[in-house]
Amino acid sequence: MSTFPAPVLGTPLSPTATRVMLLGAGELGKEVVIALQRLGVEVIAVDRYADAPGHQVAHRAHVVSMTDPQALRQVIEQERPHVVVPEIEAIATDLLVALEDEGAVRVTPTARAAHLTMNREGIRRLAAETLGLPTSPYRFVDTEQALREAIDGGIGYPCVIKPVMSSSGKGQSIIRSADDIAAAWRYAQEGGRVGAGRVIVEGFIEFDYEITLLTVRARGADGQIVTQFCEPIGHRQVDGDYVESWQPHPMSPAALQRSREIALAVTGDLGGLGIFGVELFVAGDQVWFSEVSPRPHDTGMVTLISQVQNEFELHARALLGLPVDTRLRQPGASSVIYGGVEARGVAFEGVAQALAEPGTDIRLFGKPESFAKRRMGVGLAVADDVDQARAKAARVSQAVRVRAGA
């Protein structure tokens, strides 16, 4: 029998409090805050701008440049959390590694996982070169000329270019001929999270579909770490940004088994406790590793309505050492609600109409500022099958209209 001690949770805002700090307080972080608070955890939310969604529900909020190691160390030392939970990539992960090595704080799932996944180079080299997992052919380059040479030297056309540090499809494009290279290079330089720099160029895989396999490392009843899988999530992207997702996505038994093997290999190497969003390309029974996020995934917002425990509850339970339940409740779908306007303090119309249909729900993220293509909310739906759920979720998101405030 394991000697792992049973978790003991304290009372928020008291000397017994269990304190968790989230680095990143967007819409995903907000749901993690809520899940942790339901378990009696005292939560501190940190983001680079004021009034972020997670700030609005946390016990305390800080505005900090999380890529500044000195500023990040200061807020961690001030709050003295028991656990630090990175919710975005753009963080001074070298500092997290140092703090974890010092025994000053525990990082979920691990500081190494946060460090390796903060850019595409670390995780791709781990997956392809260390673990030997199947991936698209790739090269990392630093100049437009090197990009041309990589394509001519074997990557070929079409190919995909992405900044090594970006999210939500920013800076990502498809290069179909030599005429596209200059524009694609400029777009990648503009889309990187920390400015211009290194990119990955990948050979194009003719896949049938892509999935997110939410993979959870959590303590079992005996205290041992057990890996569990949610049902596969299908999703559709436009310009590299998720616009809808659904669960479960139909797969052959062989493809599902191979997907789980790949997810088990990469998450097992990254280690720790928590949820991982493993992105995979699938063609028939063949599966290729694409990316992994050591945190809840945007396509996983469908689990807010489709699962017994959603991805945020799974992450919260796992990082606290509690058992999890990854079962699907009912086929479901999510559909993004975009801002559509450039304004602060927007208002949402059509919400009653959106929720009039049975088996629907909605999340409005509470972002203080709207942009044309900024995610401001998500429509959710369940139905007897995925196709019905997708159509219903689309009706929910389309019914909501965003307008500038008075």
From Swiss-Prot:
Residue ranges of domain ATP-grasp in the record: 125-320
Domain of life: Bacteria
Alphabetically ordered keywords of this record: ATP-binding, Ligase, Magnesium, Metal-binding, Nucleotide-binding, Purine biosynthesis
Pathway in which this enzyme or protein is active: Purine metabolism; IMP biosynthesis via de novo pathway; N(2)-formyl-N(1)-(5-phospho-D-ribosyl)glycinamide from N(1)-(5-phospho-D-ribosyl)glycinamide (formate route): step 1/1
GO biological process: 'de novo' IMP biosynthetic process
Enzyme class: ligase
An example molecular function term from Gene Ontology annotations: phosphoribosylglycinamide formyltransferase activity
Reaction(s) catalysed by this chain's protein: N(1)-(5-phospho-beta-D-ribosyl)glycinamide + formate + ATP = N(2)-formyl-N(1)-(5-phospho-beta-D-ribosyl)glycinamide + ADP + phosphate + H(+)
Positions of Mg(2+) binding: 279, 291
Function per UniProt: Involved in the de novo purine biosynthesis. Catalyzes the transfer of formate to 5-phospho-ribosyl-glycinamide (GAR), producing 5-phospho-ribosyl-N-formylglycinamide (FGAR). Formate is provided by PurU via hydrolysis of 10-formyl-tetrahydrofolate.
Protein name: Formate-dependent phosphoribosylglycinamide formyltransferase
Organism: Bordetella bronchiseptica (strain ATCC BAA-588 / NCTC 13252 / RB50)
Gene from which the chain derives: purT
